[in-house]
């Protein structure tokens, strides 16, 4: 599959960002070990990555453990190959930052049409986009939709792409739309046993 010139430029920028992120995170992880526990939270490798890459940074992303993580947004025009760029971004992330073939990607889409088209494409093992994902995962790609069972084992052993429609997680659409947050027992493996 051939990328257009602007897509090559976008992926090139993304690769540079992932490489710089990995380098900065590794050096901060080393420095963090030398600090007392109460000071470790002050090291923000994400902010430093953006500063050294001369990219504007305003976000302060932390996970549930208070650890920093990078988040990026790509604006691509209609017909600009958003799905292809997303697949390439996942591949480069796996190779340059995560340095592993497994993990979880939450793929959020804006409409039912795009949702069904993208899920259909990426479930088809003959589709070039799916083949690119399979290359990145060592042929261990799982395409899941909201409501399907997901375990820690799935994420440890596969590259899991979890599709969600933005409307299904929006408070503006009422209680019925928020069923994504309802306990179904499908995520039990993510919590320690009592």
Residue ranges with predicted function:
Residues 1-194:
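RecA-like P-loop NTPase motor core of helicase/translocase proteins
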């Amino acid at each position: 599959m051939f990328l257009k010139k602007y897509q090559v430029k976008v992926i090139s920028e993304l690769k540079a960002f992932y490489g710089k992120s990995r380098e900065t995170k590794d050096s901060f992880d080393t420095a963090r070990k030398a600090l007392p526990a109460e000071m470790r939270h002050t090291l923000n490798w994400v902010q430093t990555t953006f500063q050294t890459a001369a990219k504007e940074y305003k976000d302060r992303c932390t996970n549930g453990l208070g650890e920093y993580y990078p988040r990026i947004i790509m604006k691509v025009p209609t017909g600009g190959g958003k799905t292809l760029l997303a697949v390439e971004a996942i591949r480069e992330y796996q190779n340059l930052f995560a340095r592993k073939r497994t993990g979880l990607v939450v793929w959020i889409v804006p409409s039912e049409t795009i949702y069904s088209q993208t899920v259909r494409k990426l479930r088809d093992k003959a589709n070039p986009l799916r083949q690119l994902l399979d290359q990145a995962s060592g042929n261990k790609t799982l395409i899941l939709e909201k409501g399907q069972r997901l375990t820690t084992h799935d994420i440890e052993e596969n590259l899991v792409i979890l599709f969600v429609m933005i409307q299904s997680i929006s408070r503006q659409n009422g209680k019925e739309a928020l069923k994504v947050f309802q306990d179904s027992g499908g995520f039990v493996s993510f919590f320690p046993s009592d």
